Amino acid sequence: MIRFNNDYNHGALDSILSALTATNTESFPGYGEDIWCRRAEAVIKQLVSSEDALIKFVPGATQANLVVIAAALSPIQSVIAADTGHINCHEAASIENTGHKILALSNTDGKITAGQIAACAAAYYDGGAPEYLTEPKLVYLSFPTEKGTLYSAQELRDIREVCQKYGMYLFVDGARMGYGLGAADNDLTLKDFAELTDVFYICGTKCGALFGEALVITEPRLQYRFKAYMKQHGAVLAKGWLMGLQFAAMLENGEYFEKTKRADALAMQIREAFAAKGVPFWVESSTNQQFVILTQRQKEALARGYYFEEEGAAEQGTVVRFCTSWATTQAEVDALVADIAKL
């Protein structure tokens, strides 16, 4: 059986394992106060072209989302997100559990628009009765979205303009950031994210690391005592150098970007195979997540040799996700493409 069910089903890049082995007998300070975290921070600051950015490493994406939103919001403030956003659907109400409301907006292919955000914010800021409502203070986006789609540079600029108008923070969940950056039609860079957002993160877990996410915080108000929020929410790893070392190993030689771009290219081969058979797509995605609508017969045929993720029922059958990753091989894709041709 070959796994196309997610992008976190393998261990780590060989370069990371080699670096871990080479340093295994060395000792380092704890809690991220080590030379490897400093080294990774320096690389990331160079990539985002911001020496003033605060870089912090946390073990997982849900922790990153929880800590950022907790640090950004007071008890009477809320977060605007797509109704398909990870914080709204896949994090066991972690945001609500900290006392913050999610103002969920209807998505179009996983995205929300500047117009929707402006209307939501205006309902509070221009509504005249703020004491009865939560104050929208942060906008949460994902890049790529849960449906594998991307925001364009212009869309992000438009959303940023709305956030500035209403004094809201802009936060981008980068749990698959590498695959978004590697897509053929992407027109955003890490530097753009640093300039247009207040905080975002670069994924490690799904892009070649054993674990870890690198938060990039450019807004000074969010930087203030941020590590205390991390500790309060269980996101400070005692052996913090393990994350710094992994990001340094992936980013210094550009392997991170090579592997994620390659994963996108492999996903396009899968997409082309389904298109050639006339299999309908649930959404147009240029990233490593491809969503197709399979009949029961087609689904059963492919399930004999492959793991994939079922997303729910559709009029013509079942929405199924095929997901490539940094570890996907050409041979695995060739096998799937051949079996798709037999459908």
Predicted regions and their residues:
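Conserved C-terminal alpha-helix-loop-beta "cap" of PLP-dependent enzymes
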Residues: 74-76, 268-342
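Conserved PLP-anchoring active-site segment centered on the Schiff-base-forming lysine
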Residues: 71-89, 118
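Conserved N-terminal alpha-helix of the aminotransferase class I/II PLP-enzyme fold
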Residues: 13-61, 83-88, 94
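PLP-dependent aminotransferase-class I/II
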Residues: 99-144, 151-158
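Active-site C-terminal subdomain of aminotransferase-like
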Residues: 108, 135-136, 142, 150, ...
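Catalytic PLP-binding core of fold-type I/II PLP enzymes
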Residues: 151-183
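Hydrophobic beta-strand scaffold residues
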Residues: 102-103, 170-172, 281, 308
